[in-house]
């Protein structure tokens, strides 16, 4: 059974989807079979980022409602990324079709039997979309930009994840620039950010325009260079 990781952040624009796609591509490049699940009903984006948006017929809501078999709602991302072991399960087009947490708990473990990793891209905030996305997760990556509001929200997310039994959490500081960090003068150093969120740091990602605008291509092309 594959490991289920939810990618989350309390604040919109922190880069959850970028990290989700980048992580999925990296794992797939390393030979892992990966399923990306877009958890942002009404505002899905992974389909466009992975070049399958024109192919979509079914999504995760069609599986839980019995409209199709899971295989029909899971799309290969090989044509765009060149990775034949990377797949996407899209979110519903409408927010009202957000999957109930209990149904996520039933569906995701079944799907995870066929993959080494399942990565769930969580919507921003801590509403019903968040509760749905984290319901079946084994662990979480909390994405934060190095600004006070996002960092404060990350601490709140940490607490909510712990309340739901997800204690294996790691912090990713995204869009980091030493120059901007020094100019802001909000924090003495990165250790201060770690202390404020209460989450162990796993990565600091640079403020890279190529990575932010096209993470799939950035990751794949980097491996070939």
Model-found features: residue ranges?
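P-loop/Walker-type NTP enzyme "switch/lid" segment
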Residues: 39-113, 211-221
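Conserved nucleotide-binding/hydrolysis micro-motifs of P-loop NTPases
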Residues: 41-43, 94-95, 147-149, 176-181, ...
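Glycine-rich phosphate-binding loop used to anchor ATP phosphates in small-molecule kinases
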Residues: 111-129
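Inter-motif core of Ras-like GTPase G domains
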Residues: 127-148
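Conserved C-terminal guanine-recognition region of P-loop GTPase G domains, centered on the G4
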Residues: 152-166
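C-terminal lobe/tail of nucleotide-utilizing enzymes
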Residues: 163-225
């Amino acid at each position: 059974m594959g490991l289920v990781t939810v990618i989350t952040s309390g604040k919109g624009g922190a880069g959850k989807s970028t990290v989700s796609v980048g992580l999925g591509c990296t794992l797939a490049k390393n030979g892992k079979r990966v399923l990306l699940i877009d958890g942002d009903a009404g505002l899905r984006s992974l389909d466009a980022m992975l070049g399958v948006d024109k192919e979509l017929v079914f999504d995760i809501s069609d599986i839980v409602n019995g409209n199709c078999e899971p295989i029909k709602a899971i799309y290969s991302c090989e044509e765009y990324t060149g990775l034949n072991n990377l797949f996407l399960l899209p979110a519903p087009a409408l927010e009202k079709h957000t999957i109930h947490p209990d149904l996520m708990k039933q569906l995701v473990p079944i799907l995870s039997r066929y993959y080494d990793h399942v990565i769930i891209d969580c919507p921003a905030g801590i509403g019903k979309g968040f509760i749905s996305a984290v319901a079946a997760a084994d662990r979480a990556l909390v994405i934060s930009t190095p600004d006070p509001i996002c960092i404060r929200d990350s601490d709140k997310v940490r607490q909510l994840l712990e309340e739901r039994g997800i204690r294996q959490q790691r912090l990713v500081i995204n869009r980091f620039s030493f120059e901007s960090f020094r100019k802001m003068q909000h924090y003495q150093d990165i250790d201060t950010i770690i202390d404020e969120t209460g989450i162990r740091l796993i990565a600091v990602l640079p403020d890279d325009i190529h990575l932010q605008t096209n993470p799939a291509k950035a990751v794949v092309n980097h491996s070939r260079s």
